[in-house]
Amino acid sequence: MILGTLMNSGKLSHTVAIILKALSLGYQFGFDIMEVTGLPSGTVYPALRRLERDGLVSSSWEAEEQALKEQRPARRYYTLTRQGKEAEGAATKRYPLLTRLIPDKWGKTV
């Protein structure tokens, strides 16, 4: 239902499609998504919140111990839900160049 709403309402924008693709390729942190896509934080984080609200993305905080060990703030992990994976597939069909735009987390472009 949400996927149909996204597709029909035009809310499956380039920005949302790029963020979904980045998540599908293993980028889990907002900063990583910003770095690989070139999108600013004022675009990425509100989009991630909307995607989470709409059930396409889930998030969780990393263990505080890891952040303390690395002397930095804790990061929030974002992952695609089942519906998010469906939306990413639809995004790839709608915007086929996404497959060449973002390298996967391990360095190869798919």
Named regions from a protein language model:
Residues M1-N8, Q83-V110:
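Amphipathic alpha-helical dimerization/coiled-coil segments
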Residues L6-Y45, R49:
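N-terminal helix-turn-helix DNA-binding core of bacterial DNA-binding proteins
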Residues A22, L80, A87:
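Conserved SAM-binding loop
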Residues D54-Q71, T79:
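Beta-hairpin "wing" of winged helix-turn-helix
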Residues A74:
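Exposed loop/turn and edge beta-strand positions of beta-sandwich/beta-sheet ligand-binding modules
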